Amino acid sequence: MSDINAIRAPILMLAILPCVGDDIEVLR
């Protein structure tokens, strides 16, 4: 399980970061 999480974690971060960046720009 740890190996799968190690692979998923970076992918989830890359998938979430753009969404968070858009939200921050909208708040500005």
Curated annotation (Swiss-Prot):
Keyword presence, S-adenosyl-L-methionine: no
Keyword terms of this UniProt record: Toxin
Residues of the signal peptide: none
Cross-link (Cyclopeptide (Ile-Pro)): I11-P18
PTM annotation, UniProt: Processed by the macrocyclase-peptidase enzyme POPB to yield a toxic cyclic octapeptide. POPB first removes 10 residues from the N-terminus. Conformational trapping of the remaining peptide forces the enzyme to release this intermediate rather than proceed to macrocyclization. The enzyme rebinds the remaining peptide in a different conformation and catalyzes macrocyclization of the N-terminal 8 residues.
A GO molecular-function descriptor: toxin activity
Highest taxon in the source lineage: Eukaryota
Maturation-removed propeptide residues: 1-10, 19-28
Family: Belongs to the MSDIN fungal toxin family.
Function comment: Probable toxin that belongs to the MSDIN-like toxin family responsible for a large number of food poisoning cases and deaths.
NCBIfam families cross-referenced by the UniProt entry: amanitin (TIGR04309)
Entry protein name: MSDIN-like toxin proprotein 8
This protein's encoding gene: MSD9
